[in-house]
Amino acid sequence: MEKKWWKESVVYQIYPKSFKDSNGDGVGDIRGIIQKLDYLKELGVNVLWISPMLESPQDDNGYDISDYRRIYEEYGTMEDYEELLCEAHKRSIRILMDLVVNHTSDEHNWFIESRKSKDNPYRDYYIWKDPVNGKEPNNWGGAFGGSAWEYDPQTQMYYLHLFSKKQPDLNWENEKVRQEVYDMMKFWCEKGIDGFRMDVISMISKDQRFPDGEMNNGLYGDFGPYSVHGPRVHEFLQEMNHEVLSKYDIMTVGETAGVTIEEAQKYAGEDRNELNMVFQFEHVESGCGDYGKWTTQKYDFKEFKNIMIKWQEKLQGKAWNSLFLGNHDQPRSVSRFGNDNPVYRETSAKMLATCIHMMQGTPYVYQGEELGMTNVYFDKLEDYRDIESINYFEEFTESGLMTPEHMMKCLMLRSRDNARTPMQWDAVSYTH
């Protein structure tokens, strides 16, 4: 396989809101990241993947972008970001931007215009459908609970949102949308970024029939077969590669939930002209129950081991592996795959790190993983901020699918908030 710098790198993911607060306002920021660049250099990090720092109402903690060319004010300014790029590059650290283009915020100007009227020039930037028998266009459920469709009284139509209702899906069938995305990507490449981590990129192509999904355990149909690895996804990515990616010496990794070995080879095959690598989630989904991640069921170690071996063997010489156990969407790896009892926490963390760093592929370290940070185990719903956790708690308990007590145990084990607590820079106890 061809030698590339990203094959020899160690990537460190920063969740900016909770990484380092430089001004005491309780929110992590860009200047805080700059302050810790020497620490990251000493740690052996070559690439920083930073979760979204662009303008956003923060409904989904920045994965709902309202302006693709502005920095979120609480994180800093464009000048701060440019300084971060400069200072990181001085230390031979590259910067990977989180690219969120399956959807925008409903407060993005494109959507504000789109919902005004059926003949607005931005109408087809999003996916609008008429009601069917006075109800949603199909039975799809959203990834964060509830229906994937939201009724808009202004034009008496529904718009699609595979995530929060404040995250309307872009219509990638529209060539103008794709060009807007490519122009924005070029803007950031010209700023000097070194690549993109592409959020839920496998969902940008939808089956244009929009059929009902299969009813699994739950209240809504599964959108997966019709919106994940859709009919034109590889065409779109090859176009993106031709228009943008091939013109820069950058690294790309796509978030591709549910990807198979065969699909991964399509996304990241060296002769495919799409992405450099993908995130597969088979290993972190090991042990999921009837309601997906919301379970107290433990993972099977042998199954986990076999999954890791399979991906190593099947991608050998065909595509490049991304190696990770945790990120901003996963519970803490020590709590999930090791033992976070104080007696075993450190040993578990070292064992898991050894596992990841000794395999072939590019390893990704999530902030705090190097310290063996653990789940937080909040036992009250009001302590949670994650929209996914809150929505599913309400949906599952109100429908009777789970008792509040059982669902709370699921949140304690699986909520995304477990990974989003403040980075533990010292041993000082925090009190309200």
Predicted regions and their residues:
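Active-site and adjacent substrate-binding regions of carbohydrate-active enzymes
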Residues: 1-430
